[in-house]
């Protein structure tokens, strides 16, 4: 297993920092305690959140790798750091919705909690300044954000990932309401990048329908870190 040295800071996003390493083609992802909502307009630091998200992300990414899905995740390096493959990211967010919630309800006047059968797939441009506008494949092609082959593959992978994760969450009495996936390219292959955590998914308790995800921060519901810890506990993840 690689144990690379951290080099210079490559990029610092809203909740993660990416560092170059002495291993060509690999980066270190540092999960910080920063918590944001509304494209960064709301921001707080929540103690231990970075550690929890790193561990949950590692657990989920490993489950996807075990299911034959290419991900950028390689290994956990420290409580809040993971080694990841360096990707050329595609500037799109792929969202799969199993249950109506959030912006879908606001856009279409749909009641929250409606089961979507089949699951709904949506594309968004990754751009905080524009508030991640919803787009379609024609936009992506016309502006050169992705090729048709990449769009087809991302959609296929998004549904495969959703199937794996919906079952994974169901097994621990959680509902995967919706999730955001980001993809990148390495050696002409499409890999799942970024993270899968309560920051990037809506996750409800199966019995009570209580949100256990970042909606608790968005809506000032409190107990954000405790809810993330509950998800880790359900997955029997030992937090460092």
From Swiss-Prot:
Q: What UniProt keywords are attached to this protein's entry? A: ATP-binding, Ligase, Nucleotide-binding, Purine biosynthesis
Q: What is this protein called?
A: Phosphoribosylaminoimidazole-succinocarboxamide synthase
| One GO biological process term | cobalamin biosynthetic process
Enzyme class, UniProt record, top EC level: ligase
Record field: catalytic activity:
5-amino-1-(5-phospho-D-ribosyl)imidazole-4-carboxylate + L-aspartate + ATP = (2S)-2-[5-amino-1-(5-phospho-beta-D-ribosyl)imidazole-4-carboxamido]succinate + ADP + phosphate + 2 H(+)
Q: Which InterPro entries match?
A: SAICAR_synt/ADE2_N (IPR028923), SAICAR_synt_PurC (IPR033934), SAICAR_synth (IPR001636), SAICAR_synthetase (IPR050089), SAICAR_synthetase_CS (IPR018236)
Similarity section: Belongs to the SAICAR synthetase family.
Q: What is its EC number?
A: 6.3.2.6
Q: Name one GO molecular function term.
A: phosphoribosylaminoimidazolesuccinocarboxamide synthase activity
What SUPFAM superfamilies would the database entry show?
A: SAICAR synthase-like
Write out the pathway annotation from the protein's UniProt entry.
Purine metabolism; IMP biosynthesis via de novo pathway; 5-amino-1-(5-phospho-D-ribosyl)imidazole-4-carboxamide from 5-amino-1-(5-phospho-D-ribosyl)imidazole-4-carboxylate: step 1/2
**Which GO terms of the cellular component aspect does the record hold?**
cytosol
């Amino acid at each position: 297993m690689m144990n690379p040295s951290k080099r210079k800071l490559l990029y610092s996003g809203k909740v993660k920092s990416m560092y170059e390493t002495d291993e060509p083609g690999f980066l270190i992802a540092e999960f910080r305690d920063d918590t944001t909502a509304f494209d960064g307009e709301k921001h707080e630091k929540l103690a231990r959140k970075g550690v929890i998200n790193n561990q949950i992300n590692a657990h989920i990414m490993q489950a996807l790798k075990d299911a034959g899905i290419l991900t950028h995740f390689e290994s956990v390096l420290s409580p809040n750091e993971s080694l990841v493959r360096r990707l050329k990211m595609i500037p799109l967010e792929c969202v799969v919705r199993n249950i109506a919630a959030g912006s879908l309800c606001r856009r279409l006047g749909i009641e929250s909690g409606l089961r979507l059968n089949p699951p709904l797939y949506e594309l968004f441009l990754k751009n905080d300044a524009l508030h991640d506008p919803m787009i379609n494949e024609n936009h992506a092609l016309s502006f050169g954000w992705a090729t048709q082959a990449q769009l087809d593959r991302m959609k296929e992978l998004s549904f495969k990932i959703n199937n794996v994760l919906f079952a994974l969450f169901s097994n621990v009495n959680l509902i995967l309401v919706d999730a955001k996936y980001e993809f990148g390219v390495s050696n002409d292959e499409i890999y799942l990048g970024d993270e899968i955590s309560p920051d990037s998914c809506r996750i409800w308790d199966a019995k009570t329908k209580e949100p256990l995800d970042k909606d608790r921060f968005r809506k000032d519901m409190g107990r954000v870190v405790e809810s993330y810890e509950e998800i880790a506990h359900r997955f029997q993840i030992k937090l460092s």
